[in-house]
């Protein structure tokens, strides 16, 4: 077997990072031709959909039965408060949080005026921390009028509020035992578990005058507070290696950290990636969502010629969608 060129890699700050340690570029040199895109696509998919994180799945507010309401002496309505809570970034230690464990955060605000994420307190789990403590949640004109609890769990990818409603029904007894509030509904929220905000890549050819052309891969990665790009890349590589070990050497694999047991629910196939993870423009995402297209598979099965019939989907958006389908090998000729 002919040996491959030894590759070199390093991780450097992104050009526009402005000293942001959560935005980095992984550079890999000396790749055989074609390996740049091969590695980039695999790493990007793992980074966006398979890195574990922690996120809220529901909120309970004293005296509130649904999100389309308002509280006296509180400037913001409930929808706005929920939107603000989604901006709170949390970090946790996997060794201290069990699978399907429900974590509770309570809002402790005995003053009026501006209430922020600094007023949130974790009540039942060690090593869970609020990373951005300056997120504005609500403005009160009277102390103590907003009593709130936020419930979180660990997971991967994205879970919409409809699926979280089912989870709330399953865990209703446990939630009521955890809650300290006397009344109020458990209001479901979308959960964005992935700590990875964005992944982009660029492949350039090196020594093009030579008979043996090599490639350089630049993978730009941005993560949320508390999870460094380096740790996210390390975990993504670990997941990929475990899969390749399974295929190539079944006898020497210790895969308990990566794979679920056969009794556990299987994750959605990668082809059923949520539309929001494709990095389409917000206009394209909204238009597709209103047409009932939620996954990559559903988009791929939709006739290209019928895209023009989708409301608010212009020519540029259609071109963007076609490029994205081609990128994932889903474009039908």
UniProtKB/Swiss-Prot annotation:
Keywords: DNA-directed RNA polymerase, Nucleotidyltransferase, Transcription, Transferase
GO molecular function, one term: DNA-directed RNA polymerase activity
GO CC annotation: cytoplasm; DNA-directed RNA polymerase complex
Residue ranges of the region described as Alpha C-terminal domain (alpha-CTD): 272-333
Catalytic function, reaction form: RNA(n) + a ribonucleoside 5'-triphosphate = RNA(n+1) + diphosphate
Pfam families, per the entry: RNA_pol_A_bac (PF01000), RNA_pol_A_CTD (PF03118), RNA_pol_L (PF01193)
Biological process per Gene Ontology, one example term: DNA-templated transcription
EC number: 2.7.7.6
Taxonomy, superkingdom: Bacteria
Enzyme class (EC, first level): transferase
Region (Alpha N-terminal domain (alpha-NTD)): 1-251
Gene3D superfamilies in the record: 5' to 3' exonuclease, C-terminal subdomain, DNA-directed RNA polymerase, insert domain, RNA polymerase, RBP11-like subunit
Cross-referenced InterPro entries: DNA-dir_RNA_pol_insert (IPR011262), DNA-dir_RNA_pol_RpoA/D/Rpb3 (IPR011263), DNA-dir_RpoA (IPR011773), RBP11-like (IPR036603), RNAP_asu_C (IPR011260), RNApol_insert_sf (IPR036643)
Known partners and oligomeric status: Homodimer. The RNAP catalytic core consists of 2 alpha, 1 beta, 1 beta' and 1 omega subunit. When a sigma factor is associated with the core the holoenzyme is formed, which can initiate transcription.
Domains: entry comment: The N-terminal domain is essential for RNAP assembly and basal transcription, whereas the C-terminal domain is involved in interaction with transcriptional regulators and with upstream promoter elements.
NCBIfam families with a match to the protein in the record: PRK05182.2-5 (NF003519), rpoA (TIGR02027)
Protein family per UniProt: Belongs to the RNA polymerase alpha chain family.
Functional summary from the UniProt entry: DNA-dependent RNA polymerase catalyzes the transcription of DNA into RNA using the four ribonucleoside triphosphates as substrates.
Name of this chain's protein: DNA-directed RNA polymerase subunit alpha
Gene name of the record: rpoA
